[in-house]
Every structure is written in C-alpha cells, then in structure tokens.
A protein has these predicted regions:
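Chalcogenol-based redox active-site neighborhoods
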Residues: 1-193
Length: 193
C-alpha cells in the first residue's frame, strides 16, 4: 500500500541512484509497539525526505490488513495518516531475505518456507545507499521499539562520510568532527577529544 493505494509490484529498484532508503520491518498490524513506530516515522518523514531518503515499512501482514489499519484512527490504535509505502510480505520472502523472520520454520526441497509456528518479522532497520548497498542495519527484539532519531542520525553519518571521506566516531552527530580513516587521523581526533 503506497499513499493509500494498492501497488502490485513495489520494488526498491524504484529508488536506485536517486534516494537512500530506510527499510524497516515491524512484527504485525493492529498490535502495540508497532503503531508508535509507524507514527514516529511519519512525524519525521519530512526530515527523511529533506535528506533524499525514502522510508518503507514492511510486515508479514497482507495488503488488505495494511489497508484496514491505515483506515483506523490513531485514537483507536490505528495508523491513519501514514503516507509512506507499507509492503505486504505475506509470503515472508523479504523478511527471510533480510534475516529478520522470527518463528519456527524451514525450507523444503522446492525452496518453499514451511512453518510450524506464526512467522513475523523482528524490528529490523536497514539503511540502503543510492547504489542499493546496505550500509547500516539493526535488529530489535519484538518488545523493543526503535529510535527514529537514530535512523536520521545514521543517514546523516552516511552522507557525511560520502561527502567528506571522513568516518564518524562514536556519538557523532551533525556539526561534530569526523576523522580521517587512518592512524594519523584517529590520533589527531583522539588528541582533541
């Protein structure tokens, strides 16, 4: 579901060469921590867009389930007002490919997933550069909501590195010093901090 409309063949290739992508997985529609995260991404969407970054959410629910949740008011636990794409990974292929699929499952001789329990996604987040390369990833367990400001900081860190060729030390944020990625650079940085 993208912008309130069903899209049958959504692909991250649409953003290749043009945008960074924050691809995040969440466990289930109509649950508890999940709507807080989806609304938090929506609240910061303009900041992501200002950084040439698309936000895409994924769960193992169906597109009909996404649609119903998008029609549900925030006051009733819904995500009405969320405008970025929500991908329905009901066949679990995307969640499995990004290694965030949770549950008891295997793969049969034909390459099909077989499940002996409910399969849902962990709270994975992947920052993908304009060339389609994953540059940052983090996976939270089901009860642990993520920090959307940290996702923005990672976009800033990646663009800083790409623009300046300097790496971002621990606790770096925009406006702080980076460092040259060599022994002299780290020595210089540490002597000043």
């Amino acid at each position: 579901v993208n912008g309130g409309e069903f899209v049958s063949h959504f692909s991250l290739d649409h953003y290749a060469g043009e945008k960074y992508v924050v691809l995040f997985f969440y466990p289930k529609d109509f649950t508890f921590v999940c709507p807080t995260e989806l609304h938090a991404f929506q609240e910061k969407l303009a900041e992501f867009e200002a950084r040439d970054t698309a936000v895409v959410g994924v769960s193992t629910d169906t597109e009909q389930c996404h649609w119903a949740w998008l029609q549900t008011p925030k006051s009733q636990g819904g995500i009405q007002g969320v405008t970025y794409p929500l991908v329905a990974d009901s066949n679990k292929v995307i969640s499995s490919a990004y290694d965030v699929l949770n549950g008891e499952f295997g793969v049969d001789e034909d390459g099909n997933l077989t499940a002996s329990s409910e399969m849902i996604a962990y709270r994975g987040l992947f920052l993908i550069d304009k060339s389609g390369v994953v540059r940052h990833q983090v996976v939270n367990d089901l009860p642990l909501g993520r920090n959307v400001d940290e996702a923005l900081r990672m976009v800033d860190a990646l663009t800083f590195f790409e623009q300046h060729g300097e790496v971002c030390p621990a606790n770096w944020s925009p406006g702080k010093d980076g460092m040259k990625p060599n022994h002299a650079g780290v020595a210089d940085y540490l002597s000043k901090h």
